Curated annotation (Swiss-Prot):
It comes from the Eukaryota. Atypical kinase involved in the biosynthesis of coenzyme Q, also named ubiquinone, an essential lipid-soluble electron transporter for aerobic cellular respiration. Its substrate specificity is still unclear: may act as a protein kinase that mediates phosphorylation of COQ3. According to other reports, acts as a small molecule kinase, possibly a lipid kinase that phosphorylates a prenyl lipid in the ubiquinone biosynthesis pathway, as suggested by its ability to bind coenzyme Q lipid intermediates. However, the small molecule kinase activity was not confirmed by another publication. It comes from Homo sapiens. The active site is at 367 (proton acceptor). Residues 191-423 form the Protein kinase domain. Its main location: mitochondrion. Keywords: ATP-binding, Cell membrane, Cytoplasm, Disease variant, Kinase, Membrane, Mitochondrion, Nucleotide-binding, Transferase, Transmembrane, Transmembrane helix. Its EC number is 2.7.-.-. This is Atypical kinase COQ8B, mitochondrial. One of its GO terms (cellular component) is plasma membrane. Residues 45-86 are annotated as: Disordered. The chain crosses the membrane at residues 92-108.
Length: 544
């Protein structure tokens, strides 16, 4: 768990790292309270103080500062049209070719450095030449292979791109950062084949137009701008062929190649975390399930003045094609230039949403990529995207988890240890070294909720402090953590990371204490949980 959390506390862009579409529209005249609840859940936090409420003057300045025109969506300059290898054999051939190429690259690099005048690159360079395996030539081989095969392998690469460079080697982090920014897109004939297989030969009757070149290309699919016959602008996500059938082999092939470099820390992908990752990837390949998740979130946040969820276009919804309203705004990593008050407000809303997802809805979108959160300055709203990794949490888990967070917020180390055992995070038979490291990790991550007054996310060294504990946590763990925590901690770490990136000051303790009291009040009697969602093997329920 803390291995994943410690590595995630670093900048990330996300799989759709481009501006998308048009402004969402203003909320209308008059004063507004910018809260994710629009009701009693956290109403008192919108009144005053850093990270709480904005006055009319703040909102006026934000609207005056908005761009005159929302930028048109566009692909990365590095993206190119390239056929997706759809069969397992063709995908394996790409990984085999990569392994051979990397080996030859190592020999060439070692030969070059053994010649007179050959030496490791200085500190001022790119840093890639400091490892023969991760030379510039080999880096290019890895980038090209992952951008060609796409799918689960590229998804893992994008996940590793957000690791702290003290967590994996800086050279490898640099490679995966390039991977994140330059996914390729499939050629027209391959895209049309998927559309015909999913929507039928008459698919064009469902739309007035569909741009042939996508405006975003990600690990699992690419997104095209379209227009319905009623004039509604839509984003149509089309899945690459063969991706869903190659998840397990892709992950194993990529990790086998990377282990050649010894660049990944031992234990980074334990068996249990690999199983959880593969399950999440299978969910993300089921666009019908994603449509149901998006509809669920749209209903849960229907009255929310700050967050919006685009509507699903059900006539463009199949297992490998998903149509939704075209959304507008810029990813969170492009919001650093906003005023401190606006950055505080955005991050306050993100943290509030995380707490609501876990402890009110018990249903969370677990992908923390910044491109899944588009901020529109014209309306002071954030649009939520990409619901493929959404999942539910049972009350037994949340009952224990909220007590672990409460113990950390209260600074009670003994209680953290006991509640972690109640959560089945620990067995009770761990070594003292492991127990101490676990408690310390919980206390570090609980600091925002333990701090009186606004917590300065921009001043911490959370990633480095967690990193120092990882060797002990890997060496002495007796049992895998609860399955729910893999995705949950990735999302929470991503939210903390966004707050750090935007240098937010937020009164987190008051926010959590209110959440805690409302959670237990809602459990007497039991509050209804979010509706059941289709999982692998379940029948599809129309999201409408």
């Amino acid at each position: 768990m803390w291995l994943k959390v410690g590595g995630l506390l670093r900048g990330t862009g996300g799989q759709l790292g481009q501006t998308v579409g048009w402004p969402c529209g203003a909320l209308g005249p008059g004063p507004h309270r910018w809260g994710p609840c629009g009701g009693s859940w956290a109403q008192k936090f919108y009144q005053d103080g850093p990270g709480r409420g904005l006055g009319e003057e703040d909102i006026r300045r934000a609207r005056e500062a908005r761009p005159r025109k929302t930028p048109r969506p566009q692909l990365s300059d590095r993206s190119r049209e390239r056929k997706v290898p759809a069969s397992r054999i063709s995908r394996l051939a790409n990984f085999g070719g990569l392994a051979v190429g990397l080996g030859l690259g190592v020999l060439a690099e070692m030969a070059k450095k053994s010649m007179p005048g050959g030496r490791l690159q200085s500190e001022g360079g790119s840093g890639l030449d400091s490892s023969p395996f991760l030379s510039e030539a080999n880096a290019e081989r890895i980038v090209q292979t992952l951008c060609t095969v796409r799918g689960a392998a590229l998804k893992v690469g994008q996940m590793l791109s957000i690791q702290d460079n003290s967590f994996i080697s800086p050279q490898l982090q640099h490679i995966f950062e390039r991977v994140r920014q330059s996914a390729d897109f499939m050629p027209r004939w391959q895209m049309l084949r998927v559309l015909e297989e999913e929507l039928g030969r008459d698919w064009q009757a469902k739309v007035a137009s569909l741009e042939e070149v996508p405006f975003a290309a990600a690990s699992i699919g690419q997104v095209h701008q379209g227009l319905l016959r009623d004039g509604t602008e839509v984003a149509v996500k089309i899945q690459y062929p063969g991706i869903a059938q190659s998840i397990q082999s892709d992950v194993q092939n990529l990790l086998a190649v990377l282990k050649m470099s010894a660049a990944l820390p031992a234990g980074l992908f334990a068996e249990q975390s690999l199983q959880a990752l593969q399950q999440e990837l299978a969910w993300e390949c089921d666009y019908r399930r994603e449509a149901a998740c998006a509809q669920n979130f749209r209903q849960l946040l229907a009255n929310d003045p700050f967050f919006r969820v685009p509507a699903v276009v059900k006539e463009l919804c199949t297992t490998r094609v998903l149509g939704m309203e075209l959304a507008g705004g810029v990813p969170l990593d492009q919001c650093q230039g906003l005023s401190q008050d606006l950055r505080n407000q955005i991050c306050f809303q993100l943290l509030t949403l995380c707490l609501r997802e876990l402890f009110e809805f018990r249903f969370m979108q677990t992908d923390p990529n910044w491109a899944n959160f588009l901020y529109d300055a014209s309306s002071h709203q954030v649009t939520l995207l990409d619901f493929g990794a959404s999942r539910e949490f049972g009350t037994e888990f949340t009952d224990h988890y909220i007590e672990v967070v409460k113990a950390a917020a209260d600074g009670d180390r003994d209680c953290v240890l006991q509640k972690s055992r109640d959560l089945k995070f620990l067995t009770g038979f761990e070594t003292k070294a492991f127990s101490d490291a676990h408690v310390e990790a919980v206390m570090i991550l609980g600091e925002p909720f333990a701090t009186q007054g606004p917590y300065d996310f921009g001043s911490g060294e959370t990633a480095r402090r967690i990193q120092d504990l990882i060797p002990v946590l890997l060496r002495h763990r007796l049992c895998p953590p609860p399955e729910e925590t893999y995705a949950l901690h990735r999302k929470l770490a991503g939210a903390f990371l966004a707050c750090a990136h935007l240098r937010a000051h937020i009164a987190c303790r008051d926010l959590f204490q209110d959440t805690y009291h409302r959670y237990w009040a809602s459990r007497q009697p039991d509050a209804a949980t979010a509706g059941s969602l289709p999982t692998k093997g379940d029948s599809w329920v129309d999201p409408s």
